[in-house]
UniProtKB/Swiss-Prot annotation:
This is mRNA-decapping enzyme subunit 1. GO terms for cellular component: cytoplasmic side of membrane; nucleus; P-body; RNA decapping complex. One of its GO terms (molecular function) is mRNA binding. It comes from the Eukaryota. It is found in: Cytoplasm, P-body. Component of the decapping complex. Component of the decapping complex necessary for the degradation of mRNAs, both in normal mRNA turnover and in nonsense-mediated mRNA decay. Removes the 7-methyl guanine cap structure from mRNA molecules, yielding a 5'-phosphorylated mRNA fragment and 7m-GDP. Decapping is the major pathway of mRNA degradation in yeast. It occurs through deadenylation, decapping and subsequent 5' to 3' exonucleolytic decay of the transcript body. Its main location: cytoplasm.
Length: 193
């Protein structure tokens, strides 16, 4: 039997998902389906030269979502002022043909700049390297990797940069790891039921 409390919790969760979907849509109009979200995440970057994690200025809702990727779509060219700050702290802005079926975003509560990682299944990256070598020379991409260590979900992005995402809830941490691992190891999907 469903109680009023269960109905309220379900309604609140649906509201949160809808709100997150709409907010993400302002930053990435190609959002197609919200796959997972958690209310609190903090981003760290691994500095190999210093052999330590540096905490970045990104904290907030973390979401992983499916993107609407068309065969010949090009990534939009970012505004110069927006990309300059992001490149200094979070790596290069991707350009060229849009092969990024999924994305991870942290909707930042600290400042207006959000953190995002483009996610392409490793099979897509490998096919690009094989069938589009000229594109790979212009913008080389490497297969991504993900692991859980201590309290961080560690992600090696397409540019070999390593980020650690601290997730408040251990269950959410494991769910994010499992989802990212699935997205990287399987062929891209057009939708999730």
């Amino acid at each position: 039997m469903t109680t009023a409390r269960d109905n309220s919790a379900t309604t609140l969760e649906l509201y949160r998902k809808t709100l997150n979907f709409n907010v993400i849509g302002r930053y990435d109009p190609k959002i197609k389906q919200l796959l997972f979200h958690t209310p609190h995440a903090t981003v760290y970057k691994w500095e190999a030269g210093e052999n330590k994690w540096n905490k970045l200025e990104y904290q907030g809702v973390l979401a992983i979502y499916l993107r609407d990727v068309r065969e010949q779509a090009e990534l939009p060219v970012p505004h110069q002022e927006a990309s300059a700050g992001a490149e200094g702290r979070c790596g290069e802005v991707l350009s060229g043909r849009d092969i990024y079926n999924y994305a991870l975003i942290v909707l930042n509560r600290i400042n207006p700049e959000n953190f995002s990682i483009a996610i392409a299944p490793n099979s897509v990256v490998n096919k690009r390297r094989l069938f589009s070598p000229e594109e790979n020379v212009q913008q080389p991409l490497e297969p991504m990797d993900v692991e859980v260590k201590d309290e961080l979900v560690i992600i090696k992005n397409l540019r070999k940069e390593v980020y650690g995402i601290w997730i408040h809830t251990p269950t959410d941490r494991q769910n994010i790891y499992d989802l990212l691992k699935y997205l990287l190891e399987n062929e891209p999907k057009d939708s999730f039921a």
